[in-house]
UniProtKB/Swiss-Prot annotation:
Post-translational modification: Capsid protein p24 is phosphorylated.
Zinc finger (CCHC-type): 402-419, 423-440
Family, similarity comment: Belongs to the primate lentivirus group gag polyprotein family.
Record function comment: Matrix protein p17 targets Gag and Gag-Pol polyproteins to the plasma membrane via a multipartite membrane binding signal, that includes its myristoylated N-terminus. Also mediates nuclear localization of the preintegration complex. Implicated in the release from host cell mediated by Vpu. Capsid protein p24 forms the conical core of the virus that encapsulates the genomic RNA-nucleocapsid complex.
SMART domains reported in the protein's UniProt record: ZnF_C2HC
UniProt note: domains: Late-budding domains (L domains) are short sequence motifs essential for viral particle budding. They recruit proteins of the host ESCRT machinery (Endosomal Sorting Complex Required for Transport) or ESCRT-associated proteins. p6-gag contains one L domain: a PTAP/PSAP motif, which interacts with the UEV domain of TSG101.
Annotated lipid attachment (N-myristoyl glycine): 2
Keywords, in A-Z order: Capsid protein, Host cytoplasm, Host nucleus, Host-virus interaction, Lipoprotein, Metal-binding, Myristate, Phosphoprotein, Repeat, RNA-binding, Viral budding, Viral budding via the host ESCRT complexes, Viral nucleoprotein, Viral release from host cell, Virion, Zinc, Zinc-finger
Descriptive protein name: Gag polyprotein
Superkingdom assignment: Viruses
A GO molecular function held by the record: RNA binding
Length: 521
C-alpha cells in the first residue's frame, strides 16, 4: 500500500478512525490496522491495492467469506476489517464492526451467491448444467441434500470438498476415537452409497481400519442376500430390480439406480441408510480396536482431579459397544467404585444415586495441593496425639483428656479455644482478677500480697474532713475482718502494758523486809 494509508483519503481516514472495534468497547480503528491488513493480504494471494476501492474490497470479501466460519482468528479479523473498509468506501455510516459486517451481508447477498455458485457448478449425469428454476429439494431434506429433483427426474449432487475435508481432518485428529461415529453420522446424513464410498476412499491412511469396515460390509451384505432372495423368473419389462447386497454397497449399482431405489421405486428401498448402518457397525469395531481400554480399567489416580477422571470414564463409556441400559448400569456402579479413596469417602456420604453435578461439586478440589496439605496436617496431628498417649501409658496410669482452662470443655487446650479469652485466678478460680491480685487468701499475719508497704499494727487515722455520706456497701471480705480482730487485740495489749501492776494490801506488811532489818534497810 505504499505509505500504508493510501487505501483511504483524508476524509475516509477520519471516518475510519471513528469506528469502534466492538460495540461496547472504547478502542477504535487506527492506521496500524491498515498496515497489518496489507501484510495479511499476501498470505491469501491477494494484492494489497484491492483495499483502495469498493470493488476490490468486494472481491476480497467473496474470497474470505467461505473461509470465515471455520477460519482462524487472524482470518476473521481480516474479514471484519475489509467489511469496515467496504462501508467506508461506500459512504455507509457505521459505528462498530458488527454493523459493518451486517451491512456487507445485506449488500453483497453472500449467502444467496454461494448457494447459486454451488448449484451452477454441479452438472447432470448427461453433462448438461442444471437449471436452478427447476431444481427442488426433497421433502424433509436440507439444501445440501445429495439428490435434487429437476422436473420428474432426480439429479445427484456430489459431496462438497469442504465436507470431505472436514471428514479427513476428523479422522486424522481423532484417530478413530469415540467421536468418529457421531461425526460420520452427521456428515453422511441422506447420502447415497456412492457418496459414502467416496468418504471412505479419501482416507489415505488407516487402511487396517478400513479393511475391518470392508469385512463388516461383506458380512452384512451376505446376510442381506440370504434374507432377501431374488424373485424367481425374469422381471417384467421396465421394472426395477431389487437391490442385492453388492448393490447396496455400491459396487454393482450405478448412481442413477441408487437414486431410483431411494426415491422412485415401489416399494422404496433406502439403500443409502442401509449402507450407512453397515459402515457405522464397522466404525464401532474400529473404535473398539483403537481404544482397547475398557471402562472396567478406568480408575482415578491418587492425585488426579475428579473432573478429569469423569471425562476419561465417560469417554470409555462412549466407546463401549453396549446398550443404553448396560451403559447406565456401568455408570451408576463403576463411577463411584473406581474413584480414589478420598473421593470415594465423599461420594458415599452423598446418599443413594447422587447426580453428576452433586458429585463434581462435592469432590471439587480433592487431590489438589491445598487438600493434600490439609490431609497431611490432620495425619501429623493424629500421629502426635497417639505418640503422646503411648508415652503416657508407659509411665503408669493414662493421662486424663485435655481440658480447656478458658471454657472448661474437654478436647482442646486454652490456645485452641474458639471462645474469647477470660481472665481467671489460679488460686480461687474466680474470674476477673489474677493470682497475684487475689484477695481470697491471706498470710499468717492477716495481710495479703496486694499490699505494697509494711503493714501497721493499728488502723491509720484519716486526717481531714470525713465525708457525711455513708460509705458504699462493700462485699464481705474475711481478710478485713481478720485484720480488724488483730488490730483490736493489739490495742488491748497496749492498754494493759500502760496500767501498773495490781498490789494486794495484805502483802505490804507481812512480806516487807522492814520487819526483819528495821531501819538498816
Amino acid at each position: 500500500m505504499g505509505a500504508a494509508t493510501s487505501a483511504l483519503n483524508r476524509r475516509q481516514l477520519d471516518k475510519f478512525e471513528h469506528i469502534r472495534l466492538r460495540p461496547t468497547g472504547k478502542k477504535k480503528y487506527q492506521i496500524k490496522h491498515l498496515i497489518w491488513a496489507g501484510k495479511e493480504m499476501e498470505r491469501f494471494g491477494l494484492h494489497e491495492r484491492l483495499l483502495e476501492s469498493e470493488e476490490g474490497c468486494k472481491k476480497i470479501i467473496e474470497v474470505l467469506y467461505p473461509l470465515e466460519p471455520t477460519g482462524s482468528e487472524g482470518l476473521k479479523s481480516l474479514f471484519n476489517l475489509v467489511c469496515v473498509l467496504f462501508c467506508v468506501h461506500k459512504d455507509k455510516e457505521v459505528k462498530d464492526t458488527e454493523e459493518a459486517v451486517a451491512i456487507v451481508r445485506q449488500c453483497c447477498h453472500l449467502v444467496e451467491k454461494e448457494r447459486n455458485a454451488e448449484r451452477n457448478t454441479t452438472e447432470t449425469s448427461s453433462g448438461q448444467k442444471k437449471n436452478d428454476k427447476g431444481v427442488t429439494v426433497p421433502p424433509g431434506g436440507s439444501q445440501n441434500f445429495p439428490a435434487q429433483q429437476q422436473g420428474n427426474a432426480w439429479i445427484h449432487v456430489p459431496l462438497s470438498p469442504r465436507t470431505l475435508n472436514a471428514w479427513v481432518k476428523a479422522v486424522e485428529e481423532k484417530k478413530f476415537g469415540a467421536e468418529i461415529v457421531p461425526m460420520f453420522q452427521a456428515l453422511s446424513e441422506g447420502c447415497t452409497p456412492y457418496d459414502i464410498n467416496q468418504m471412505l476412499n479419501v482416507l489415505g491412511d488407516h487402511q487396517g481400519a478400513l479393511q475391518i469396515v470392508k469385512e463388516i460390509i461383506n458380512e452384512e451384505a451376505a446376510q442381506w442376500d440370504i434374507a432377501h432372495p431374488p424373485p424367481a423368473g425374469p422381471l417384467p419389462a421396465g421394472q426395477l430390480r431389487d437391490p442385492r447386497g453388492s448393490d447396496i454397497a455400491g459396487t454393482t449399482s450405478t448412481v442413477q439406480e441408487q437414486l431410483e431405489w431411494i426415491y422412485t421405486a415401489n416399494p422404496r428401498v433406502d439403500v443409502g441408510a442401509i449402507y450407512r448402518r453397515w459402515i457405522i457397525l464397522g466404525l464401532q469395531k474400529c473404535v473398539k480396536m483403537y481404544n482397547p481400554v475398557s471402562v472396567l480399567d478406568i480408575r482415578q489416580g491418587p492425585k488426579e482431579a475428579f473432573k478429569d477422571y469423569v471425562d476419561r470414564f465417560y469417554k470409555a463409556i462412549r466407546a463401549e459397544q453396549a446398550s443404553g441400559e448396560v451403559k447406565q448400569w456401568m455408570t451408576e456402579s463403576l463411577l463411584i467404585q473406581n474413584a480414589n479413596p478420598d473421593c470415594k469417602v465423599i461420594l458415599k456420604g452423598l446418599g443413594m444415586h447422587p447426580t453428576l453435578e452433586e458429585m463434581l461439586t462435592a469432590c471439587q478440589g480433592v487431590g489438589g495441593p491445598s487438600y493434600k496439605a490439609k490431609v497431611m496436617a490432620e495425619m501429623m496431628q493424629n500421629m502426635q496425639s497417639q505418640n503422646m498417649m503411648q508415652q503416657g501409658g508407659q509411665r503408669g496410669r493414662p493421662r486424663p483428656p485435655v481440658k480447656c482452662y478458658n471454657c472448661g470443655k474437654f478436647g482442646h487446650m486454652q490456645r485452641q479455644c474458639p471462645e474469647p479469652r477470660k481472665m481467671r485466678c489460679l488460686k480461687c478460680g474466680k474470674p476477673g482478677h489474677l493470682a497475684k491480685d487475689c484477695r481470697g487468701q491471706v498470710n499468717f499475719l492477716g495481710y495479703g500480697r496486694w499490699m505494697g508497704a509494711k503493714p501497721r499494727n493499728f488502723p491509720a487515722a484519716t486526717l481531714g474532713v470525713e465525708p457525711t455520706a455513708p460509705p458504699p456497701p462493700s462485699p464481705y471480705d474475711p481478710a478485713k475482718k481478720l485484720l480488724q480482730q488483730y488490730a483490736d487485740k493489739g490495742k488491748q495489749l497496749r492498754e494493759q502494758r500502760k496500767k501498773p501492776p495490781a498490789v494486794n494490801p495484805d502483802w505490804t506488811e507481812g512480806y516487807s523486809l522492814n520487819s526483819l532489818f528495821g531501819e538498816d534497810q
